Amino acid sequence: MNVAVTAVGGGVGQSIIKALQHTEYSTIGINSEVLGAGLYATRKSYIGPYANDPKYVDMMIKICRKEKCAAIFPGLDIELSPLSNNIKRFKNNDILPAVSDPTVIAICADKLKTCEFLQSNNFPSPRTFRLRDYSFELNFPITLKPQKGGHGSIGVLEVHDRREFDRYVASVDVNNYIVQECIEGDEYTCGTVTLEKRCVGTILMKRELRAGDTYKAFVVKDEKLSSFVRAIINALKPFGACNVQLRLRDNVPYIFEINARCSGTTASRALAGFNEPKIICDYVSKGITNPRFEIKEITILRYWKELAVSYDKIERMKSEGFIQNENIEL
């Protein structure tokens, strides 16, 4: 079965490619920029439009139909809404977008709505306020972060006193920022897969960050925490991969972000025995709703890897918007 993966110049798209490299599924890479590394590590690759282009959905369907892709995996948050809003169009062309419905996308794309969802379902989350309405209800330190559109640690500010607060507030859009309680403790990134409104698997990784990205991860087995994450996902009811980020304080998990997509650590999870893209592909191609997997408690050390690409191949991609690759892996 062929599978399209978008935004393969970025970490999420590349992680999906790596997770599927040694499976029966063949990936077709799509990226809007010619120098996206993933374009040169999939069997076939295409230059595609940006997600805000009116032709984006038509082009994704055209590429998927041409390559007989039964599923399409998004690699960027900005692609989630156009794919989700057009699920029916894709399905009418025998293509399943690995995305949740628009209601779930809206909750996860807005950190304030995420907190409201968690609170309404009695799950712990940091106390959170709109920046424009904030009246110093929290003790310092506090965290300022974008309400919508942020990813990784971009735009996230830890504030230690009123002087810092005033300085930072003057430099941000107060209508798109929230103030959040700082939760100290071990940070976890938790992968899940949901099929037919039921969470069918979870994986827990304690992580260390560098510049907002996971660079050391430790896979742990903790049934109590797994059950907690599963309960959140069963309440949210996404489709496919969904990533929960939390911190443990006094053994209480506080969720501060939910991403309704695969993660930059998707390939790391596959190494530990929990291959989210493969589970989803097995569902699409074989109808498997109760996947079997065995999670290994291992340490994942992430590092840069170089990919050498000839000038000729890059020029062909520029001029033709399409190339074929052989025996190249990320």
How should these model regions be labeled?
Residues N234-L271:
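Conserved metal-phosphate-binding beta-hairpin within the catalytic cores
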Residues M1-A98:
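ATP-binding N-terminal substructure of ATP-dependent carboxylate-amine bond-forming enzymes
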Residues V159-K237, R247-L248, V252-Y254:
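Phosphate-binding site of ATP-dependent enzymes
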Residues K278-L330:
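Peripheral (often C-terminal) accessory segments that flank ATP-dependent C-N-forming ligase machineries
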Residues F218-V219, S263-I279:
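ATP-dependent carboxylate-activation loops
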Residues V104-E184, T194-R198, E223-S226:
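Active-site nucleotide/adenylate-binding loops and adjacent lid/helix of ATP-dependent enzymes
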